[in-house]
Amino acid sequence: MIRKIWFVFFLAAASSFAQQSYDLVVYGGSAAGVTTAVAGARQGLKTVLLEPRDHVGGLVSGGLSGTDVGKREVIGGLALEFYFRAGRHYGLNRHHQELAWMPEPKVAEAIFREMLKEAGVTLLERHRLREKTGVRKEGTRIIEITTENGTRFQGKIFVDTSYEGDLMAQSKVSYTTGRESTAQYGESLAGVRALTPSHQFAVEIPARTADGTLLPEVSGAPRGEPGTADQRIQAYNFRVIATNVAANRIPWPKPDNYDVKRYELLAIYLTKMTPYLGRPLDINEVNLLRVIPNGKADWNNRGGFSSDYIGKNYDYPDGDYSTRARIWRDHEDYQKGFYWFLANDPRVPTELQAQMREWGLPKDEFVDTGHWPHQLYIREARRMVGPFVATQKDLQTDLVKPDAIAMGSYGADSHNVQRFVNDRGFVENEGDFQVSASVNPYHIAYRVLTPQREEVTNLLVPVCFSATHAAYSSMRMEPQYMMLGHAAGIAAQLAIRDHAPVQDVQIVDLQRQLKAEGAIFQYGPEFQAQALTILRRRFAAPPRQGPLPWGYPEKRAAK
């Protein structure tokens, strides 16, 4: 009898583990995933956040500390709350400077976890969507999703906040990858670029050696005709955090499968640039360093040959998990080898090499991943094709939207897409554009979050949202992801309240609640000041003591 009771209890427990029901199921622990889950939970929804690996915050806690803010005055809502909390962590309110736009990764992740805990969100890590068969639908509604460990999650509303858009894709939502042609939507920034002046080789480097062998890291495929569409993806890299504080510094690691031939083009580039400039390249000309607190810097790509691994990510968006893991490892090996080469190869100018050796990985960041970032910078992967597709004009001329849920302002920014052999036989990069002057603060429409009605009616997509490559190049910044996630969480509550498809959410109610929570729909310092007033009411000022962390200058009130 006792055995029978225990057997029944075991079956009940196993069943409970195998199937869980929630109002809101959020897939992907990116910063957008956190804000989506927090917003929904604060609205009273029973919410779960599923993260495929074991960190939350995505790039914001994974190395992208040098936040791409554009015009700071457009950032509001839960995104602003995150940077406000970071400011409180660093004590910046004591110096009439409340927002920390560049928090250290470990600080960012701690804040995100705190927000999730306070809101009562169930966070389940190492819950990756089962490949190919992870989504069950009935008609246009997702009924449940299944993770690799066999757990099934039923929900009323689902939100895909992953960088890859796997939940979206398995739900049979229309999407695209790569670049549209200039003709498709009338976009001057679309398609293959005729000229790529930025992050280019300033000197001519033959693409082939004397015996005709193509240099490593150069593609032999043709560039393509300017303005035509292709399936190529802008380059990925890791946003590495480095320090020049000796007590906290670990020397640049040498990858196990280091191959010096991989950097032959870099060696030639460095050698040719010295006579061209009349001096060796500086560390800031092969890496973009952005100072963050406590003696650290966020390192990004800069120049013709840098940390971007150009042309090696084309199979990532639609790749299976094993393909993506291979590409991820390849990027890590390449970038570690790039830093090792600069710090150790005898062909590197001594001045540049000495600068590189002043820096290394910090002991106090990414301690469970060898002090290397836990997140690859997936700048772009799948992009949903919804009933409304944001295009270049939505950044430049068609700025006002009746269904606005957030604002963007960052310049149109695409990294290089390919490295090829030009008509004269020299190495050339293609695909980068940096367009800021003609991009004005603009509304982001709720419609970019919603799939086509005939496909899915209970899914929202705040990261792989509906936009062209040109529009996505501006809208893809982490503060915007966070604000779109905030809107998705509230929209989920409204859809559940009204028993309505996500396409029919009451926009007036959505905007009213967002504004009450500090969202910004107009550009100007006074509107962010109103949002900050809301935050100050929620958070008591901490004790005023101690100096500011290194990297934040003293800022005192004007007298």
Located regions from the model:
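Beta1/beta-strand and adjacent pyrophosphate-binding region of the FAD-binding site
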Residues: Q19-S30
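Conserved beta-strand-loop-beta-strand element in the redox core of flavoprotein oxidoreductases
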Residues: T133-R152
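Sec-dependent N-terminal signal peptides
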Residues: K4-A13
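Conserved N-terminal/central alpha/beta ligand/cofactor-binding core
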Residues: L45-K46, E51-E138, T176, Q184-G186, ...
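Sec/Tat signal peptide C-region and signal peptidase I cleavage site
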Residues: A14-A18
